Amino acid sequence: KFNALVEEGAGFEEDRDEYEAENIFWVPKEARWTFIKDNAKDSKIGQYIDDAMILIEKENPSLKGVLDKRYARPEIDKRRLGELIDLISTIKLHQNGEKDLLGRVYEYFLGQFASVEGKGGGEFYTPTSVVKTLVDMIEPYQGRVYDPCCGSGGMFVQSEKFVEDHQGKIENLSIYGQEMNATTWKLCKMNLAIRGLDANLGPHHDDTFHHDLHKTLKADFILANPPFNISDWGGNQLTDDVRWKFGIPPAGNANYAWLQHMVYHLAPNGSAGI
């Protein structure tokens, strides 16, 4: 977008309204990659990166408290940090490249991290093939989409792709999610931000069963890959919960609780893919 505005020659490349109109989050000059790259060999590069993260959060409230700001720590080798920046800077990105390139790179690394983590990686990442199958089945073309255990946001990203592939308007899709793990919640926020997707993930990470952040939500579509067979979900503290319309879930297994939670939040004519 920046390069396109420069080519127009009207001087609007630093007008943040031009970016916000297309749901592109604004990055101040001192937080842009060109600034970081130009200072890669400076001994204060860690502080420059931390300052850049602070600026981005300040200009984009949806990312407040999400970005890591610990690059100035003494234990981080600033020479190697600079070398990493130089290495990344060798990647050639051109103006007419794929719109979703950064998002695809982010998704690739999420998949790699999940692979390394093994079974534990499933807590924040569902394979793209599985997500695509679920989305293609329930067809979230427009309406409210909800994932009560959203992980890194794969269901939302694939829903956006579905809308685009069917010539729909992404603004007709409202995204709601909740995530218990603090780090994973941040991963999801960043994943959606770099794709320009607005979402209501609640003001913080939290337990879906014990602190439902979307109590009144009735979703048109629910997409989820819940962590099955959780035994210590605290069910004995929720025996009178309004969500258990079809019986109290067993205290030693959360599977039935997940199903009832989703049924409770589903609109009368809604669809769910689990």
Task: Give the residues covered by each predicted segment.
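Conserved Class I SAM-dependent methyltransferase catalytic core
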Residues: 134, 185, 250-274
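Short acidic (Asp/Glu) and glycine-rich catalytic loops that position anionic groups and cofactors
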Residues: 85, 198-204, 237-242, 270-274
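Alpha-helix N-cap/helix-initiation motif
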Residues: 83, 120-123, 177, 247-251
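Conserved S-adenosyl-L-methionine
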Residues: 120-224, 229-233, 240
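Short, solvent-exposed loop/helix junctions and linker helices
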Residues: 78, 216, 252-256
